[in-house]
Amino acid sequence: MKILLVGEYSRLHNSLKEGLLKLGHQVVLIGLEDGFKKYPMDLLIQKKYDSGFLKKIKIFLYRIFRIDISSLSIERQVRKHQKELTGHDVVQFINENALSCSPKVAKRIFDFFRKENKKTFLLSCGTDHLSVKYAFEKKLRYSLLTPYFNGKSSKSENRFVLSYLDRAHESLHHWIFKHIEGVIASDLDYHLPLKNHPKYKGCVPNCINTSLFEATPLKTAGKIRIFHGINKENYYRKGNDFFEKALAIVEKKYPERIEVLTVSNLPYDVYIKSY
């Protein structure tokens, strides 16, 4: 089959692509690099106007004319690759807003992909309307919004997550669900909000390419090294404050036996070789 994967979070689509290629399928991966992680793409989409003077221009144009030039730039880049993005048997989106655009532009990009290809599927992976709504209504004992509810993080720090509750994102959600063949959860956080939904296909855990990691016996003759990788942007939502408190206790209790290595915001290729 010819398969098109749109977007990337936490190397999920890269790992899936490697497995699909081994099974004999043709696969194209298009997307952003997932921020500082810089995952490889077949067709790389650059998110422009996000820093310096260009960001100021973007903010000015949006405030005055409600035009998001960053989203329009992403849409133009997608359409430039039209030849490579058409005629696939299956398209899978990593998220309802796989390329981090405004909802209006995300809808147009979604329509472009679904009209130019055959079957369209969606992953519930990362923040989306249903999972954020479920968390906001406190239907989970713990969720990505628990730090917000407990006052550890502000509304401003959670504005990206909370934006999935606004009318524009809700409209995008309903439009996408109307036109997809099905939706797949990648984790329990996304499985629970989707239970009993007519288009829910079930939970498929994140795939891992085990051939990239050699299994070696654990040797603990010297110090036990504990590696902690932090995404600063999601510090509280990922529970890093709890990890750091626990590691401090262990390190203090066993100073001769424990060594803790903590890194922040490393590109994936550097991160994976750091421990």
Q: Where do the model's predicted regions map?
A:
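Acceptor-binding helix/loop patch of EC 2.4 sugar-transfer enzymes
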Residues: D42, L122-D166
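N-terminal subdomain of nucleotide-sugar transferases
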Residues: M1-L43, K115
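Membrane-proximal helix-turn-helix segments that form the acceptor-binding/catalytic region
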Residues: E75-H81, R108-K115, L145-G182
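Short N-terminal targeting/anchoring amphipathic segment
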Residues: K2-V6, H81-V105, K119-L123
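Conserved donor-binding/catalytic core segment of Leloir-type glycosyltransferases
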Residues: G202-I208, L212-K238, E244-L247
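A conserved nucleotide-sugar
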Residues: I224, D241-I272
